[in-house]
């Protein structure tokens, strides 16, 4: 690297530092005094279910007053309590209302009633990366790199706020109308200084230290990035088997096999991300995220242009207009029932 290039890289890293310091101030204000109860259910027309989970569903809704479409996440308080997800749910809302980044889905409103908790988010009409990846089979390396770069920047932002994301997978990455990523589902995200011990995540994406019940840190997100890049470029994850226990054995073994079409730069990056030894894993060393950003596989990536969303996306989802749900699967519809008596009031006071 010549002197000029080194100087440019140095000044870029300085301005990133400044940007993140300012971002942290903004985040902390909202983190310390979270917004509450900014809308109510009868202000929305419910249109269609976009996804379901163990304690709720996500619906496309239309805000009556503005005509805007949103994705409304509806969580049944009693089910959240039964599944011991109170802490995770409170975390999700508190984090979402405080963050602000181009590749994070925006929380527009949140409120609760006797039965449910509601998070109303920007509607991202392109659907999950998961469905596009399965349809296409696998992404070319430039295509995978475009998405990976956005995740790298997003993790750099979140980690600077002491947030661990812990749930990276193609199902949680939505593609917007410009072809960029919107990270959704902060149900496992957590503000942690130092280490944490909770077992959570998706089997294929779990870092070895989580499986081995060790205290772990932000480095689990960089491991998961390795899994995601591999899955995007191969069409299948690096560690898979029928039973979670078999997946865990493969993950902990530290052995990865690469498809023959992977470039040598990609294999090198993945060996450094899917690194069982935490003292060697990229993202967790003294240069932090810069070991990843400066890696040869990302040599063509203009990080600032990605952040500014100025790079042309490799793929734009088909979109028939506002409220189009053709990029989502169909689910059985169910009435939203609200009890006349308050359920689990105490547990969710701070929501």
UniProtKB/Swiss-Prot annotation:
Keywords: ATP-binding, cAMP, Cell membrane, Cell projection, Cilium, Cytoplasm, Cytoplasmic vesicle, Flagellum, Kinase, Lipoprotein, Membrane, Mitochondrion, Myristate, Nucleotide-binding, Nucleus, Phosphoprotein, Serine/threonine-protein kinase, Transferase. GO terms for cellular component: acrosomal vesicle; axoneme; cAMP-dependent protein kinase complex; centrosome; ciliary base; cytoplasm; cytosol; glutamatergic synapse. The keyword Transport does not apply. GO terms for biological process: adenylate cyclase-activating G protein-coupled receptor signaling pathway; adenylate cyclase-inhibiting G protein-coupled receptor signaling pathway; cAMP/PKA signal transduction; cellular response to cold; cellular response to glucagon stimulus; cellular response to glucose stimulus; cellular response to heat; cellular response to parathyroid hormone stimulus. Its EC number is 2.7.11.11. Allosterically activated by various compounds, including ATP. Activated by cAMP; the nucleotide acts as a dynamic and allosteric activator by coupling the two lobes of apo PKA, enhancing the enzyme dynamics synchronously and priming it for catalysis. It is an enzyme of class 2 (transferase). Residues 299-351 form the AGC-kinase C-terminal domain. Its main location: cytoplasm. The keyword Kinase applies. This is cAMP-dependent protein kinase catalytic subunit alpha. It comes from Mus musculus.
